[in-house]
């Protein structure tokens, strides 16, 4: 009998018995199991052992007014989750507005980076340059490392700040700068400060022939002056209380000139008009000593009983000051004494006094 002719339900009970005993009975039986639903259920009902789907159950929940500790905990959790959702939505809205103002990226850019995308890599050919943190003055540190060779150290590329009157000094290197700083690109000289004195105390002149006892001379008696390089110390001051000449000629003033020894060219003084009152001075390295010796020389004239014209006991120095009368030519620098004054429009020649002041030069009083 062929296998195809055998009835479908025919089987040997002896052969099938041992096979049925060894086989798992659960695998043979088809038990209809209840399908597991993925739809959400009510949490309040679930706490009390009841399974109810949320669809259409919001207003029909039997435990909606329950205040047990489980239901209270669920209520607090819902409030916290609602606050978190509201905060996240507010932050996303602010971020979108900020990006739209700058126009840097689309509003979906934060979500794009949030999903774990990698940042753009360094382009090929620039792997050997590692940028370092910037210094306060804008200098950037670059560490060039050529392939196959060891670098000698980071190189500092810096640029000087904007032009300023003060000299620029680089900032000392920080802990990340093992190399040396480059020298500054330029150096500026320090600024020159000049002070202007508006009022000077008066020193009385001793009486001598040709001068009024009420004559006063303006001399600075406080503090050294500010030095200004490239000039010679000269002090000139008009004296008041002099007799006036003819009305047709302008009245001249007596003047005191102080000049140190060693000046290459003598300074000449021109007569001043009646309305002019000038106090011109420039400071030098020993201005204060010059003023003190000049004041001592003026005090020494009190005890002098010589003629109006006093010649120094020391041979004259070529560097002494050249004396000018209001209407006479200057005396030569290398001559002895003073040259005679030529004819003048004034009725009588004016007296003068010259006194030598050691190494500082000579002092001359004109009228």
Swiss-Prot record:
Keywords of the record: Differentiation, DNA-binding, Metal-binding, Nucleus, Sexual differentiation, Transcription, Transcription regulation, Zinc
Subcellular location, principal: nucleus
GO CC annotations, alphabetized: chromatin; nucleus; XY body
Entries under Pfam families matching the protein: DM, DMRT-like
Gene Ontology BP term (one): spermatid nucleus elongation
Stored InterPro entries: DM_DNA-bd, DM_DNA-bd_sf, DMRT, DMRT-C1/C2_C
Keyword match Signal: no
Tissue: Expressed in testis and pancreas.
Key word Ion transport present: no
Entry's localization field: Nucleus
Segments of the chain annotated as binding DNA: 42-89
The protein's role, per its UniProt record: May be involved in sexual development.
The name this protein goes by in its record: Doublesex- and mab-3-related transcription factor C2
Gene: DMRTC2
């Amino acid at each position: 009998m062929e296998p195809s002719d055998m009835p479908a339900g025919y089987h040997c009970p002896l052969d099938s018995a041992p096979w049925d005993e060894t086989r798992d009975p659960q695998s043979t039986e088809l038990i209809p199991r209840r399908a597991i639903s993925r739809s959400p259920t009510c949490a309040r009902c679930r706490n009390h052992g009841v399974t109810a789907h949320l669809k259409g159950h919001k207003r029909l929940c039997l435990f909606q007014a329950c205040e047990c500790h489980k239901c209270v905990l669920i209520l607090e959790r819902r409030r916290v989750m609602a606050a978190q959702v509201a905060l996240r939505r507010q932050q996303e809205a602010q971020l979108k507005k900020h990006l739209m103002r700058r126009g840097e990226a689309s509003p979906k850019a934060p979500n794009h980076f949030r999903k774990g995308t990698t940042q753009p890599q360094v382009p090929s050919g620039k792997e050997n340059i590692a940028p370092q943190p910037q210094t306060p003055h804008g200098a950037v540190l670059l560490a060039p490392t050529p392939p196959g060779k060891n670098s000698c150290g980071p190189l500092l590329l810096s640029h000087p700040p904007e032009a300023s009157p003060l000299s620029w000094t680089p900032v000392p290197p920080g802990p990340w700068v093992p190399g040396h700083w480059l020298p500054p690109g330029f150096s500026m000289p320090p600024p020159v400060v000049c002070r202007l004195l508006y009022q000077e105390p008066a020193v009385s002149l001793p009486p001598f022939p040709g001068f009024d006892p009420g004559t006063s001379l303006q001399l600075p008696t406080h503090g050294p002056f500010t030095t200004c390089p490239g000039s010679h110390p000269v002090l000139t001051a008009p004296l008041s209380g002099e007799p006036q000449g003819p009305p047709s000629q302008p009245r001249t003033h007596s003047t005191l000139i102080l000049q140190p020894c060693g000046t290459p060219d003598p300074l000449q003084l021109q007569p001043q008009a009646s309305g002019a009152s000038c106090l011109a001075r420039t400071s030098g390295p020993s201005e204060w000593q010059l003023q003190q010796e000049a004041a001592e020389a003026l005090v020494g004239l009190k005890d002098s009983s010589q003629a109006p014209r006093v010649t120094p006991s020391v041979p004259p120095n070529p560097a002494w000051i050249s004396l000018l009368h209001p209407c006479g030519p200057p005396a030569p620098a290398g001559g002895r004494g003073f040259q005679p004054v030529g004819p003048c429009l004034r009725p009588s020649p004016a007296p003068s006094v010259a006194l030598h002041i050691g190494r500082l030069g000579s002092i001359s009083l004109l009228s």
